[in-house]
Protein backbone atom coordinates (compact mmCIF):
# COMPACT_ATOMS: atom_id res chain seq x y z
CA UNK A 1 0.00 0.00 0.00
CA UNK A 2 1.41 3.38 -0.94
CA UNK A 3 1.82 6.23 1.49
CA UNK A 4 -1.14 8.56 1.66
CA UNK A 5 -0.44 12.04 0.31
CA UNK A 6 0.00 14.79 2.88
CA UNK A 7 -2.46 17.07 1.13
CA UNK A 8 -4.26 19.56 3.30
CA UNK A 9 -7.98 19.06 3.63
CA UNK A 10 -10.16 22.11 2.83
CA UNK A 11 -11.20 22.70 6.41
CA UNK A 12 -11.13 20.83 9.68
CA UNK A 13 -12.92 17.50 9.68
CA UNK A 14 -15.35 16.55 12.43
CA UNK A 15 -15.61 13.36 14.41
CA UNK A 16 -18.42 12.08 16.57
CA UNK A 17 -17.92 13.36 20.08
CA UNK A 18 -16.71 10.76 22.56
CA UNK A 19 -16.46 12.19 26.06
CA UNK A 20 -13.72 11.41 28.50
CA UNK A 21 -10.79 10.83 26.16
CA UNK A 22 -7.35 12.24 26.52
CA UNK A 23 -7.50 13.83 29.97
CA UNK A 24 -4.04 13.41 31.50
CA UNK A 25 -4.48 11.56 34.82
CA UNK A 26 -2.63 14.08 36.98
CA UNK A 27 -4.66 13.18 40.07
CA UNK A 28 -3.56 9.55 40.13
CA UNK A 29 -1.67 8.42 43.24
CA UNK A 30 1.25 6.73 41.45
CA UNK A 31 4.09 9.21 41.00
CA UNK A 32 5.39 10.36 38.72
CA UNK A 33 2.80 10.69 35.99
CA UNK A 34 4.70 9.81 32.81
CA UNK A 35 4.14 11.64 29.52
CA UNK A 36 5.58 10.16 26.32
CA UNK A 37 6.98 13.07 24.28
CA UNK A 38 6.24 13.08 20.54
CA UNK A 39 8.84 12.51 17.85
CA UNK A 40 7.68 13.47 14.36
CA UNK A 41 8.04 10.64 11.87
CA UNK A 42 8.19 7.97 14.58
CA UNK A 43 5.57 8.20 17.34
CA UNK A 44 2.46 7.95 15.17
CA UNK A 45 -0.68 5.98 15.96
CA UNK A 46 0.90 2.65 15.02
CA UNK A 47 3.86 3.32 17.30
CA UNK A 48 1.64 4.39 20.19
CA UNK A 49 -0.62 1.36 19.84
CA UNK A 50 2.22 -1.17 19.74
CA UNK A 51 4.05 0.49 22.63
CA UNK A 52 0.92 0.66 24.74
CA UNK A 53 0.11 -3.01 24.15
CA UNK A 54 3.62 -4.43 24.57
CA UNK A 55 5.18 -2.23 27.25
CA UNK A 56 2.79 0.33 28.71
CA UNK A 57 4.35 2.57 31.34
CA UNK A 58 3.26 5.82 29.69
CA UNK A 59 0.22 7.49 31.24
CA UNK A 60 -0.22 10.00 28.40
CA UNK A 61 0.99 9.87 24.79
CA UNK A 62 1.58 13.36 23.38
CA UNK A 63 0.74 13.73 19.70
CA UNK A 64 3.09 15.44 17.24
CA UNK A 65 2.01 19.07 16.93
CA UNK A 66 -0.45 20.36 14.37
CA UNK A 67 1.04 23.37 12.59
CA UNK A 68 -2.00 25.64 12.33
CA UNK A 69 -2.55 27.74 9.22
CA UNK A 70 -4.80 30.63 8.29
CA UNK A 71 -7.04 28.28 6.31
CA UNK A 72 -7.44 26.04 9.39
CA UNK A 73 -6.83 22.96 7.26
CA UNK A 74 -4.92 19.89 8.40
CA UNK A 75 -2.71 17.37 6.67
CA UNK A 76 -4.18 13.95 5.97
CA UNK A 77 -1.78 12.34 8.43
CA UNK A 78 -2.68 14.92 11.11
CA UNK A 79 -6.39 14.17 10.76
CA UNK A 80 -5.73 10.46 11.03
CA UNK A 81 -3.35 10.87 13.96
CA UNK A 82 -5.86 12.72 16.13
CA UNK A 83 -8.84 10.55 15.22
CA UNK A 84 -10.46 8.63 18.10
CA UNK A 85 -10.09 5.39 16.14
CA UNK A 86 -6.31 5.82 16.02
CA UNK A 87 -6.08 6.29 19.79
CA UNK A 88 -8.67 3.90 21.21
CA UNK A 89 -7.94 2.93 24.81
CA UNK A 90 -5.09 5.41 25.34
CA UNK A 91 -4.78 8.79 27.02
CA UNK A 92 -3.44 11.12 24.34
CA UNK A 93 -2.69 14.83 24.35
CA UNK A 94 -3.12 16.72 21.04
CA UNK A 95 -0.74 19.63 20.52
CA UNK A 96 -0.79 22.76 18.35
CA UNK A 97 1.85 25.14 17.05
CA UNK A 98 0.63 28.68 16.37
CA UNK A 99 1.10 32.33 17.33
CA UNK A 100 -2.53 33.24 16.58
CA UNK A 101 -4.99 32.95 19.50
CA UNK A 102 -7.99 32.79 17.17
CA UNK A 103 -6.43 29.86 15.30
CA UNK A 104 -5.74 28.08 18.56
CA UNK A 105 -9.24 28.69 19.88
CA UNK A 106 -10.81 27.28 16.70
CA UNK A 107 -8.51 24.25 16.85
CA UNK A 108 -9.48 23.63 20.48
CA UNK A 109 -13.11 23.33 19.38
CA UNK A 110 -12.00 20.75 16.84
CA UNK A 111 -10.16 18.86 19.58
CA UNK A 112 -13.36 18.92 21.64
CA UNK A 113 -15.38 17.60 18.69
CA UNK A 114 -12.91 14.71 18.46
CA UNK A 115 -13.82 13.86 22.04
CA UNK A 116 -10.71 15.01 23.87
CA UNK A 117 -10.83 17.01 27.07
CA UNK A 118 -7.33 18.50 27.10
CA UNK A 119 -4.91 19.90 24.52
CA UNK A 120 -1.46 21.46 24.54
CA UNK A 121 0.16 24.64 23.20
CA UNK A 122 3.72 24.26 21.94
CA UNK A 123 6.06 27.00 23.17
CA UNK A 124 8.99 24.59 23.21
CA UNK A 125 9.96 23.72 19.64
CA UNK A 126 13.45 25.21 19.04
CA UNK A 127 13.68 24.53 15.30
CA UNK A 128 14.89 27.66 13.45
CA UNK A 129 12.26 27.10 10.74
CA UNK A 130 9.65 27.46 13.49
CA UNK A 131 11.17 30.12 15.74
CA UNK A 132 12.05 32.57 12.96
CA UNK A 133 8.29 32.90 12.38
CA UNK A 134 7.68 33.62 16.04
CA UNK A 135 6.14 30.24 16.78
CA UNK A 136 7.16 27.51 19.20
CA UNK A 137 9.86 28.75 21.55
CA UNK A 138 10.21 31.78 19.26
CA UNK A 139 7.31 33.26 21.25
CA UNK A 140 9.58 33.44 24.30
CA UNK A 141 11.69 36.20 22.72
CA UNK A 142 9.05 38.83 23.50
CA UNK A 143 7.41 38.41 26.93
CA UNK A 144 4.98 41.26 26.26
CA UNK A 145 3.77 39.60 23.06
CA UNK A 146 3.44 36.28 24.89
CA UNK A 147 1.32 37.89 27.60
CA UNK A 148 -0.84 39.62 24.97
CA UNK A 149 -1.35 36.29 23.18
CA UNK A 150 -2.41 34.53 26.39
CA UNK A 151 -4.67 37.40 27.46
CA UNK A 152 -6.55 37.17 24.16
CA UNK A 153 -6.70 33.38 24.33
CA UNK A 154 -8.08 33.18 27.86
CA UNK A 155 -10.45 36.13 27.41
CA UNK A 156 -13.11 33.58 26.47
CA UNK A 157 -14.01 30.21 27.96
CA UNK A 158 -12.11 27.44 26.21
CA UNK A 159 -13.91 24.22 25.19
CA UNK A 160 -11.17 21.99 26.66
CA UNK A 161 -8.47 22.30 29.28
CA UNK A 162 -5.23 23.74 27.91
CA UNK A 163 -1.69 22.84 28.91
CA UNK A 164 1.54 24.29 27.57
CA UNK A 165 5.05 23.05 26.83
CA UNK A 166 7.81 25.63 27.12
CA UNK A 167 11.53 26.17 27.26
CA UNK A 168 13.15 28.24 29.98
CA UNK A 169 14.21 31.06 27.69
CA UNK A 170 15.27 31.93 24.18
CA UNK A 171 18.85 33.14 24.61
CA UNK A 172 19.51 32.55 28.30
CA UNK A 173 18.18 30.74 31.35
CA UNK A 174 18.13 34.15 33.04
CA UNK A 175 14.91 34.80 31.12
CA UNK A 176 13.10 32.02 32.98
CA UNK A 177 11.93 33.91 36.12
CA UNK A 178 10.03 36.38 33.93
CA UNK A 179 8.55 33.67 31.73
CA UNK A 180 7.59 31.61 34.77
CA UNK A 181 5.84 34.63 36.28
CA UNK A 182 3.77 35.01 33.10
CA UNK A 183 2.79 31.34 32.86
CA UNK A 184 1.84 31.20 36.53
CA UNK A 185 -0.83 33.81 35.86
CA UNK A 186 -2.98 31.65 33.57
CA UNK A 187 -5.18 28.58 34.27
CA UNK A 188 -3.12 25.95 32.47
CA UNK A 189 -3.95 22.31 33.20
CA UNK A 190 -0.21 21.70 33.47
CA UNK A 191 3.04 23.27 32.26
CA UNK A 192 5.74 21.06 30.76
CA UNK A 193 9.17 22.62 31.19
CA UNK A 194 12.07 21.57 28.99
CA UNK A 195 14.99 22.76 31.10
CA UNK A 196 17.03 24.18 28.22
CA UNK A 197 16.87 27.39 26.22
CA UNK A 198 16.06 27.64 22.54
CA UNK A 199 19.72 28.31 21.72
CA UNK A 200 20.75 25.14 23.56
CA UNK A 201 18.45 23.01 21.39
CA UNK A 202 18.79 19.42 22.71
CA UNK A 203 22.49 19.45 23.63
CA UNK A 204 24.66 20.83 26.38
CA UNK A 205 23.87 21.12 30.04
CA UNK A 206 20.40 21.25 31.53
CA UNK A 207 19.08 23.65 34.17
CA UNK A 208 17.12 21.64 36.75
CA UNK A 209 17.08 24.67 39.03
CA UNK A 210 14.55 26.16 36.58
CA UNK A 211 12.13 23.39 37.50
CA UNK A 212 12.68 24.08 41.19
CA UNK A 213 11.78 27.71 40.53
CA UNK A 214 8.60 26.57 38.78
CA UNK A 215 7.58 24.72 41.93
CA UNK A 216 8.29 27.83 44.01
CA UNK A 217 6.34 30.06 41.60
CA UNK A 218 3.36 27.72 41.91
CA UNK A 219 3.13 27.15 38.19
CA UNK A 220 0.13 24.83 37.64
CA UNK A 221 1.21 21.17 37.78
CA UNK A 222 4.75 21.53 36.41
CA UNK A 223 5.99 18.59 34.33
CA UNK A 224 9.76 18.07 34.11
CA UNK A 225 11.33 17.44 30.69
CA UNK A 226 14.98 17.13 29.74
CA UNK A 227 17.57 14.33 29.66
CA UNK A 228 15.58 11.65 31.46
CA UNK A 229 17.23 8.61 29.87
CA UNK A 230 17.31 6.08 32.72
CA UNK A 231 15.48 5.12 35.91
CA UNK A 232 18.40 6.66 37.80
CA UNK A 233 17.81 10.00 36.08
CA UNK A 234 14.16 9.97 37.16
CA UNK A 235 14.97 8.88 40.71
CA UNK A 236 17.58 11.62 41.02
CA UNK A 237 15.04 14.20 39.87
CA UNK A 238 12.44 13.02 42.38
CA UNK A 239 15.05 13.08 45.15
CA UNK A 240 15.98 16.64 44.22
CA UNK A 241 12.37 17.77 43.70
CA UNK A 242 10.08 15.64 45.94
CA UNK A 243 7.10 17.82 45.00
CA UNK A 244 7.42 16.86 41.32
CA UNK A 245 4.19 15.28 40.07
CA UNK A 246 5.06 14.38 36.51
CA UNK A 247 7.80 13.91 33.94
CA UNK A 248 7.92 13.91 30.16
CA UNK A 249 10.28 11.45 28.49
CA UNK A 250 11.16 11.36 24.81
CA UNK A 251 14.56 10.07 23.74
CA UNK A 252 14.77 7.83 26.80
CA UNK A 253 11.66 5.96 25.63
CA UNK A 254 13.03 5.63 22.09
CA UNK A 255 16.22 4.03 23.42
CA UNK A 256 14.41 1.87 25.99
CA UNK A 257 10.71 1.24 25.29
CA UNK A 258 10.36 -0.43 28.71
CA UNK A 259 11.63 2.64 30.58
CA UNK A 260 8.22 3.64 31.91
CA UNK A 261 7.61 0.12 33.17
CA UNK A 262 11.03 0.07 34.84
CA UNK A 263 10.38 3.41 36.55
CA UNK A 264 7.35 1.74 38.14
CA UNK A 265 9.47 -1.20 39.33
CA UNK A 266 8.88 -3.53 36.38
CA UNK A 267 11.32 -5.59 34.36
CA UNK A 268 13.68 -4.44 31.64
CA UNK A 269 12.89 -5.49 28.09
CA UNK A 270 14.37 -8.83 27.07
CA UNK A 271 15.66 -9.65 23.59
CA UNK A 272 12.54 -11.61 22.65
CA UNK A 273 10.38 -8.68 23.69
CA UNK A 274 12.50 -6.21 21.74
CA UNK A 275 12.39 -8.46 18.69
CA UNK A 276 8.58 -8.57 18.93
CA UNK A 277 8.54 -4.77 19.37
CA UNK A 278 10.52 -3.95 16.25
CA UNK A 279 8.79 -6.63 14.18
CA UNK A 280 5.30 -5.39 15.12
CA UNK A 281 6.25 -1.80 14.32
CA UNK A 282 7.71 -2.77 10.97
CA UNK A 283 4.66 -4.82 10.00
CA UNK A 284 2.31 -2.02 11.05
CA UNK A 285 4.22 0.61 9.12
CA UNK A 286 4.60 -1.67 6.10
CA UNK A 287 0.83 -2.17 5.97
CA UNK A 288 0.25 1.59 6.04
CA UNK A 289 3.18 2.81 3.98
CA UNK A 290 5.62 1.44 1.45
CA UNK A 291 8.13 -1.15 2.68
CA UNK A 292 11.07 1.19 2.13
CA UNK A 293 9.39 3.85 4.29
CA UNK A 294 8.71 1.31 7.03
CA UNK A 295 12.33 0.19 7.05
CA UNK A 296 13.50 3.81 7.10
CA UNK A 297 11.37 4.51 10.16
CA UNK A 298 12.69 1.43 11.93
CA UNK A 299 16.28 2.47 11.25
CA UNK A 300 15.57 6.01 12.46
CA UNK A 301 14.09 4.62 15.69
CA UNK A 302 16.99 2.20 16.19
CA UNK A 303 19.51 5.05 16.11
CA UNK A 304 18.59 5.67 19.75
CA UNK A 305 19.36 2.23 21.26
CA UNK A 306 22.47 2.10 19.03
CA UNK A 307 23.68 5.53 20.17
CA UNK A 308 27.27 5.43 21.37
CA UNK A 309 27.96 1.93 19.99
CA UNK A 310 30.09 2.27 16.84
CA UNK A 311 29.73 -1.39 15.86
CA UNK A 312 25.94 -1.36 16.15
CA UNK A 313 25.67 1.91 14.23
CA UNK A 314 27.83 0.52 11.43
CA UNK A 315 25.69 -2.62 11.21
CA UNK A 316 22.51 -0.53 11.24
CA UNK A 317 23.72 1.66 8.36
CA UNK A 318 24.34 -1.44 6.26
CA UNK A 319 21.09 -3.20 7.19
CA UNK A 320 18.57 -3.56 4.36
CA UNK A 321 15.99 -5.91 5.90
CA UNK A 322 14.07 -5.91 9.16
CA UNK A 323 16.02 -9.00 10.24
CA UNK A 324 19.39 -7.32 9.73
CA UNK A 325 18.13 -4.20 11.53
CA UNK A 326 17.08 -6.26 14.54
CA UNK A 327 20.45 -8.02 14.51
CA UNK A 328 22.19 -4.64 14.57
CA UNK A 329 20.07 -3.25 17.41
CA UNK A 330 19.85 -6.22 19.80
CA UNK A 331 22.66 -8.47 18.68
CA UNK A 332 20.68 -11.41 17.33
What are these regions (language model features)?
Residues 1-3, 13:
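Methionine residue identity
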Amino acid sequence: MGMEPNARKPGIMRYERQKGRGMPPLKQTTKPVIYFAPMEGITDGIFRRVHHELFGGADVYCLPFHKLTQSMSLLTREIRDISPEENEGMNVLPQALTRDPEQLSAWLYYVSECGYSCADLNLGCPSPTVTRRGRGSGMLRDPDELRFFLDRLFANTLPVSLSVKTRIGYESAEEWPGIAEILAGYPFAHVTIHVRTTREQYTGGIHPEAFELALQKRIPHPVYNGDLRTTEDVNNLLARCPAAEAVMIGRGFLADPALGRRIRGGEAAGKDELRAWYTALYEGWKDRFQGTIALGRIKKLMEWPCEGDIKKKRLLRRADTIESCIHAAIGE
